[in-house]
């Protein structure tokens, strides 16, 4: 069955395509597979504070990836109107990481990164901070100036430039600091009915796990949900996510949703995670790189439908081209947009027939016209290659030593010296 994915949302005066099981899947599904006479939702809508998200699916914040352009593309595939919750969204799409210092200083690039499309609801922003006072000030800006409807806090980043300052996945080790930051942002969010969530990892390494204690602390401070990437900082993106940690967190945290993250490469992976852990929803990161239609699959799967997207190469090329156009609108700079799209090209073309010479040329593309010329050389009829186009994508790497501030692991509380260091260690730039 071949359709088109060039217009993920049907026009207002048109009727959406209807799959053979009666599921409205819009015009975004391309070639789709699977049908059945009945649909039974796997999970109820996801409730995050006042927001009701139709499908329990969240786009993970990814530095340098989840800008307004990419969120728009994912939203077109995930939100075709079917199953949207009370907040008008079928999935939740979170911004890339925004550092609180850069926001408080109103850094020009940061202020651009927190902008949303008018139709983007709820407006979701992830904040990174290592200082409660700066975190509070940043949250106050977002709430008092009506710039966000949901705030997520980053306690999961494993990169050295973050952990060496005591931030990201290193921070929950300091119990008092973690609670102070979470509590400050929750308090500011409450002033505007803006719910706050946290995203974290299992811990620093296997000997320094923090997720259960941190999850309970966040729950006590009043967060609206807790998300767990089921790897340690030392694992980074290597190895296999330990979904049993998600199950244990779900058993411990009982008053707010628990979301699972890690190794969701397909809708079937998401369903399996829910079945094995009992989590209330899933957070999808690397699995959607070059596959924004994964959100169509996920929405269908959680609605009880077996419809899946299997686009031909021409449809994939059109999605890539549209992504580049959205980046051009976002940056207001075609050359910069083309430099950005380069990193996505291998993900889009994964498993498809495209020679090394063409791939090399695409990796150097510097204009939309050049991109069009190169994409025109692809065989648009080449079918979806199945397993070769699916599975793991994005960075993986190997386990590594976690770089931490001196003496960080000696005590669970901040020393006066560490408190002074942390207060001056806020990152001054947002994103990737």
Q: Model regions: which residues?
A:
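Alpha/beta catalytic cores of nucleotide-metabolism and tRNA/nucleoside-modifying enzymes
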Residues: 1-53, 57, 63, 210-225, ...
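Glycine-rich, positively charged N-terminal anion/phosphate-binding segment
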Residues: 37-47, 62-145
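N-terminal small/glycine-rich loop or linker at the start of catalytic domains
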Residues: 46-58, 101-122, 157-167, 185-202
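Active-site mouth loops of central-metabolism enzymes
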Residues: 56-66, 122-135, 171-172, 198-210
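Hydrophobic faces of well-ordered beta-strands that scaffold small-molecule active sites
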Residues: 57-61, 93-95, 123-127, 151, ...
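Active-site beta-loop-alpha junctions enriched in small/polar residues
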Residues: 62-64, 98-100, 128-130, 156-158, ...
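A structural motif
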Residues: 79, 90, 147-148, 223, ...
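Alpha/beta enzyme core
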Residues: 84, 136-167, 171-256
């Amino acid at each position: 069955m071949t359709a088109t994915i060039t217009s993920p949302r049907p026009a207002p005066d048109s009727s959406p395509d209807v799959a053979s099981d009666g599921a409205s899947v819009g015009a975004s599904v391309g070639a789709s597979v699977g049908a059945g006479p009945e649909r039974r939702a796997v999970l109820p809508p996801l409730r995050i504070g006042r927001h009701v998200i139709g499908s329990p699916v969240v786009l993970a914040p990814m530095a340098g990836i989840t800008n307004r352009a990419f969120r728009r593309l994912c939203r077109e595939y995930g939100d075709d109107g079917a199953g949207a919750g009370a907040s008008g969204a079928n999935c939740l799409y979170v911004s890339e990481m925004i550092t609180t210092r850069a926001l408080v200083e109103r850094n020009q690039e940061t202020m651009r990164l927190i902008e949303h499309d008018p139709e983007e609801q709820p407006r979701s922003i992830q904040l990174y901070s290592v200082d409660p006072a700066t975190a509070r000030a940043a949250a106050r800006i977002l709430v008092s100036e009506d710039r966000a409807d949901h705030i997520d806090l980053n306690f999961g980043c494993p990169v050295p430039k973050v952990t060496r300052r005591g931030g990201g996945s290193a921070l929950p080790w300091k119990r008092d600091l973690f609670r102070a930051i979470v509590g400050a942002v929750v308090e500011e969010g409450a002033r505007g009915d803006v719910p706050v969530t946290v995203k974290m990892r299992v811990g620093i390494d296997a000997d320094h796990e923090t997720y259960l204690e941190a999850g309970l602390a966040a729950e006590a401070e009043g967060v609206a949900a807790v998300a767990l990437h089921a790897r340690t900082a030392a694992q980074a993106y290597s190895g296999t996510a330990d979904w049993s940690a998600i199950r244990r967190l779900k058993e411990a945290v009982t008053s707010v949703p628990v979301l699972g993250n890690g190794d969701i490469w397909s809708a079937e992976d998401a369903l399996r995670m829910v079945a094995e852990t009992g989590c209330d929803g899933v957070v999808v990161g690397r699995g959607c790189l070059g596959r924004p239609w994964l959100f169509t699959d996920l929405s269908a799967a959680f609605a009880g439908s077996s419809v899946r997207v299997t686009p031909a190469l021409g449809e994939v090329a059109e999605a890539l081209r549209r992504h580049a156009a959205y980046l051009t609108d976002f940056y207001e700079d075609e050359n910069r947009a083309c430099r950005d799209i380069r990193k996505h090209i291998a993900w889009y073309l994964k498993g498809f027939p495209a020679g090394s010479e063409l791939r090399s040329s695409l990796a150097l593309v510097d204009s939309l016209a050049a991109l069009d010329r190169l994409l025109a050389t692809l065989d648009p009829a080449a079918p979806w290659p199945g397993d070769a186009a699916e599975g793991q994508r994005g960075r993986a790497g190997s386990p590594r030593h976690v770089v931490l501030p001196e003496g960080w692991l000696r005590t669970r509380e901040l020393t006066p010296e560490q408190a002074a260091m942390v207060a001056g260690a806020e990152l001054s730039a947002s994103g990737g």
